[in-house]
Amino acid sequence: MKNLISVHDVENIHHLLEQALMFKREPLAERSLGSGKKLGLLFMNPSLRTRVSTQIAASNLGMECYVLNVGADNWPLEFREGAIMDGSNVEHIRDAAPVMGGYFDLIGVRTFPSLRDRTLDYSEHVIHSLMKYGGRPVLSLETATVHPLQSLADLMTIREFLPEGRRPKIAMTWAPHVKPIAQCVANSFSEWICAWGQADFVVAQPEGFELNESFLCGARVTYDQKEALEGADFVYMKNWCSYRDYGRVHGSAHEWMMTLDHLKLTNQAKLLHSLPVRRNVEVSDEIMDHQDCLAKNQAAN
């Protein structure tokens, strides 16, 4: 595996999942695997769980890890080809990436979408520029369209709580939010669940908030949240802004906030959220504090 950008870079998702669970049980099992290697983590946006967990994972493998916060620890970067750099961006990725490639054996990058220019965001120009000019394997720590490490942690959590002897139903339900939120977590979760192929998967959202079909991989889609929740064994709660009317926030959809009344429709479902969460906007306090909420398990994975 040269790069890990999405589930499409994973040769065998079942093997990867078992390996990840093994490392959870025995975190120092391959302490010398990364000996002598250096991992550079390039953060263009805030991060808590991805940042810390990746640093810990690198340490457990014996790697040295270096964190760079773009615009804070190092110069603001320019990614446009042919740009006349007379603005606030000081260094071009064509110059910075080869330098980082000389320092590091592996480069991780985290970047958010603009949520203004769909074509540019979905081209994944940031991570592709790093892959093009860095000369090193690249690890996605979240990009404009996907979040593979989050999805792997999600799948690990589901695997740990699978009901015995039957195929589970997994519902991903849209949740309200006060500002535009990227589609990357929802896109990625859909891709990974469909690639895993061990569950009946349904996505529920209001009209106008359909995800890009290329990420749904044939998953069932409904505008009826109650229908999606009916009999679900797992419920993934997540906001995303409109793809069709790119970046738009739903004006009023409080009824989509997950509450105990919604939970009653499920098959005593385990509850998932990638965090951070806007309590009592996306999800009620009672849901986040519920014994079946696995958000902290996801973070640990």
Regions found by a protein language model. Name each.
Residues 33-39, 166-169, 268:
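Phosphate-coordination loops involved in phosphoryl transfer and adenosine-cofactor binding
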Residues 1-52, 56:
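Positively charged, low-complexity intrinsically disordered leader regions
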Residues 57-59, 66, 126-142, 201-204, ...:
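P-loop/Walker A phosphate-binding loop and immediately adjacent motor/lid segment at beta-alpha junctions
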Residues 4-6, 137-166, 171, 274-301:
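Peripheral docking tails and interdomain loops at the edges
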Residues 44-66, 159-237:
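Glycine-rich phosphate/diphosphate-binding loop of Rossmann-like nucleotide-binding domains
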Residues 32-40, 47-159, 278-279:
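Phosphate/diphosphate ligand-binding glycine-rich loop within oxidoreductases
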Residues 215-293:
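Rossmann-like adenosine-cofactor binding region
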